[in-house]
């Protein structure tokens, strides 16, 4: 894979997604970001990162800021690639905005086909497969020029009454206030995208072997730092806003790249369930072998109600 040698150690430490196997350029060859971050606050950066601008040909354009690189903050943004949680959010946003869908998002699957480059617009072209009063199906393709970088599909649908509802995932999280002094993610090897998230770990972080010989689980309260209420875009961002759980099982972290991410949205968050945007997450390794690593994330509201879950497949390199 044509990736700069000096960048490999960064990925091995704290970043969660490598460029695709057919990436054409090393990170050092990627043009600089178009964002003028010097004069933007963190909320401004986050809002700009989620922004999709309609273009004359019907596409929606996003500009990728190096502030959302998965490379470490101690290196230039070009040492990493655009954060996959943000790209998932952009795919979801492009379908809703471009197709005028009003029903709640209930599932999203994103395939990461190739690495998008900084300094170029990323264009999304959504398409409705089938609309309906109760359920609607949509897809979107994202790319730069003739290069396809992402493909996503989504299911939207209205909620309805259920005679006997069951919530087996109900699990009250630890008190947010009790973890107000808990550690977060910081230091020179922290990925740039993590600067836009508040973290409060329960018995963590355990990266670089902290879970060796134990269940491979990380539990953490998280919120996006823009002060906005939690919505589907921010949930997409947070469901991927941690290092691979497998990296807590090994002192020497294995190289891997995400190939797809599926998110299921079980309930729309309310201010009571996500106070000030905070949600409790559990990231868990499900399988690691045969050249693959599969993990999941579950998001709970403050009352223990399950809000969303995600499953991610990564190719070991």
Give, region by region, the residue ranges found by the protein language model.
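Short, surface-exposed alpha-helical recognition segments that flank or form part
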Residues: 2, 19, 82
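Short, positively charged and aromatic/hydrophobic N-terminal segments
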Residues: 20-22, 29, 33-36
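Sequence-pattern detector for short linear motifs
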Residues: 19-20, 54
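Ala/Thr-enriched low-complexity intrinsically disordered regions
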Residues: 4-5, 15, 25-26, 33
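N-terminal, intrinsically disordered, basic low-complexity segments enriched in Arg/Pro/Ser/Thr
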Residues: 10-11, 19
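Terminal targeting signals and extreme-terminal segments of soluble enzymes
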Residues: 11-14, 34-317
């Amino acid at each position: 894979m044509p990736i700069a040698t000096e960048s490999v150690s960064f990925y091995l430490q704290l970043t969660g997604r490598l460029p695709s196997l057919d990436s054409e350029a090393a990170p050092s060859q990627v043009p600089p970001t178009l964002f003028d971050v010097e004069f933007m606050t963190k909320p401004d950066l986050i809002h700009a990162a989620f922004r999709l601008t309609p273009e004359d040909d019907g596409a929606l354009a996003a500009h990728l800021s190096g502030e959302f690189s998965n490379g470490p903050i101690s290196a230039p943004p070009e040492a990493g690639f655009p954060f996959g949680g943000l790209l998932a959010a952009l795919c979801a946003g492009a379908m809703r905005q471009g197709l005028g869908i009003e029903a709640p998002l209930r599932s999203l699957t994103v395939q990461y086909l190739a690495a998008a480059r900084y300094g170029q617009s990323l264009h999304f072209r959504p398409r409705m497969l089938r609309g309906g009063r109760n359920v609607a199906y949509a897809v979107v393709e994202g790319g730069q020029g003739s290069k396809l970088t992402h493909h996503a599909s989504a299911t939207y649908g209205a909620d309805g009454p259920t005679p006997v509802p069951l919530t087996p995932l109900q699990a009250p999280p630890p008190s947010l206030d009790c973890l107000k002094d808990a550690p977060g993610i910081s230091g020179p090897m922290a990925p740039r995208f993590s600067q836009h998230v508040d973290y409060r770990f329960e018995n963590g972080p355990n990266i670089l072997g902290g879970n060796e010989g134990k269940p491979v689980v990380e539990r953490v309260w998280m919120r996006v730092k823009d002060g906005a209420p939690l919505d589907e875009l921010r949930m997409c961002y947070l469901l991927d806003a941690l290092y691979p759980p497998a990296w807590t099982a090994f002192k020497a972290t294995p190289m891997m790249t995400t190939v797809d991410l599926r998110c299921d949205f079980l309930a729309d968050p309310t201010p009571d369930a996500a106070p000030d945007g905070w949600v409790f997450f559990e990231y868990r390794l499900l399988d690691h072998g045969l050249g693959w690593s599969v993990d999941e994330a579950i998001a709970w509201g403050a009352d223990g109600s399950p809000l969303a879950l995600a499953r991610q497949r990564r190719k070991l390199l």
